[in-house]
């Protein structure tokens, strides 16, 4: 979607803008869980899934490559930062592998449709839902292979439904507003 605003810019400018936005989204993915845990306690991450929204935004705004990158880097950077700076890893080491795969899928799948969302921002609603289903399917498959029971996994999915609903509303709303702003800016140039 940011390509809309960068159509007349050089490749170097496009890459610089996309890299900057990606870094900001990774920082957001590290910061939002900290805020959620400070407000809602230890279970807030599982309920609100705050690290997932920046990957969805990255995919929709920047495309699949950047969405995948933000999705993979977010839990890794969060793990490293919280381990070194706070002394308590978040996500926990046992959760890191599936979160890398799951959040990476969120960014990848939402990014596969970024060009279509740019043309018709209303499509961001089904795109976010598809990315969420894909990511949760990866979560389920990975953890079943790792030997966790379906019942405990289903409980985890149900716990995160509040966050999924919130993302399904907020991410498309942000995409629609940004698309309108970018189109308005493009017309005024």
Feature-to-residue mapping (PLM):
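Membrane-embedded alpha-helical hairpins and interfacial helices in multi-pass inner-membrane proteins
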Residues: 37-45, 83-100, 112-189
């Amino acid at each position: 979607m940011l390509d809309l605003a960068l159509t007349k810019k050089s490749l170097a400018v496009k890459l610089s803008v996309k890299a900057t936005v990606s870094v900001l989204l990774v920082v957001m993915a590290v910061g939002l869980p900290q805020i959620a845990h400070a407000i809602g306690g230890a279970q807030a991450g599982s309920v609100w899934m705050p690290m997932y929204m920046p990957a969805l935004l990255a995919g929709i705004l920047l495309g699949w490559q950047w969405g995948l990158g933000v999705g993979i880097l977010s839990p890794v950077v969060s793990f490293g930062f919280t381990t070194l700076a706070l002394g308590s890893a978040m996500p926990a080491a046992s959760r890191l592998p599936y979160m890398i795969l799951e959040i990476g899928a969120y960014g990848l799948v939402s990014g596969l449709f970024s060009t279509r969302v740019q043309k018709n921002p209303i499509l961001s609603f089904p795109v976010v839902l598809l990315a969420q289903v894909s990511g949760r399917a990866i979560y389920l498959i990975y953890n079943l292979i790792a030997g966790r029971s379906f019942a405990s996994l289903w409980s985890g999915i149900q716990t995160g439904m509040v966050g999924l609903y919130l993302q399904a509303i907020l991410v498309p709303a942000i995409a629609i507003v940004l698309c309108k702003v970018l189109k308005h800016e493009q017309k005024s140039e």
